[in-house]
Amino acid sequence: MAPNTRASRSRVFRAKNKVSSLILTPLINIPLIRRDDNLADIIVASLQDSRITLEDDDILVLAQKIVSKAEGRAINLVTVTPSARAIELAKQTEKDPRVVELMLQESNEVLRTRPGAIIVEHRLGFVCANAGIDHSNVAGAGDSVEEWVLLLPTDPDRSARKMRDEIQVKTGKRIGILIIDSHGRAWRNGTVGIAIGIAGLPGMVDLRGHPDLFGYTLRVTQIGAADELAAAASLMMGQAAEGTPVIHVRGFPYELREAALNELIRPKEQDLFR
């Protein structure tokens, strides 16, 4: 029997999670998405066009925009009547009061404001700028681009589960789905891709209690694995006019399991930035 040492347990853990490569491939021929489009059908067709055959434990990463568009989350600002509070905040932040009204509707709490930005606790629980509402690459048929904005999906975890289930039925493969968006961070400049909807892969990987390379027991290490993958996929998607909103991932170094976004949201009592 092998000795039950910290070093031997470390070797077992590393071998289990060791990956020769992590491969991210943008899917081709994804059309401009409209309301009520069947994303599962579109993605399966794109996989075929991209000459990718799904395997068990593959992951598909979707840009939030195509999910929101398919779910009808585009809002024409002509239909929005701003409240008194929205009008006041709009003056302070130099924003369109109609957009500010939507931010208030999408948020639990306004945390910070300055000209050009409103920081909120989104109704989904995370902190973000402008409630995740987007003007770019949003248009309605026959209307000015500037009159339309796009809200985040109502329940991104549910959207991810539905997408995962539909694609698994169509392909017979066990996969994960990640829906991502671009967010800033309180302590760094620049936006990065983060997970906002998860199905079939871990949000967090808890390494506490596992040995490190030298056999010492880790005490605090928890990896935001879904956010790490989201950032990698965001590099492939780009932030402007690249038109590659779905990324196929092979070689994710952790076992797939059921999870939800709340794994990644820090409780308020532990949030030192509020």
Predicted regions and their residues:
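N-terminal and secondary-structure boundary signal
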Residues: 9, 13-274
